[in-house]
């Protein structure tokens, strides 16, 4: 019932000290949650070439600021995040991971650009000649559910018959693990 939970990220103690939660971060996150709830769309661009369009109609928006005071809630520290869970099929465009960005999966800074093409929530292409793009492609290919063409592109379309529809349904569920689940951004001044 009244339990409050705080998940502490596996960060260096210096980062935790630098990213202490405060009332100002809480107010900023709550303001941005309201903005996300009131928006119909979000566009993300960058000098590196990112041009991502996210439909927000019907999206669930939330966030966290690194501490919790209400019973029955969970947060994580460091905090300071506003995010949205958009409807299926509403994320499209190009996302470029540029040198200096962090790839949390590999716990490393990106050294050479990776360009991801996203269509209806799915990464349909991973471009880049450097080690970072190679690591991303091999990581996704290692799961063995994208076929010889590389990463899973989109749920397969049934070709007819109940067996084909059942196989497509199973394949679609498996590939949904690769779809965009949420989009968000940080608001913690100490992280800048």
Model-derived features: positions:
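Active-site bordering "gate/hinge" segments
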Residues: 1-119, 134, 144, 149-163
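Dual-mode signal for accessory low-complexity, basic/Gly-rich regions
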Residues: 109, 125-192
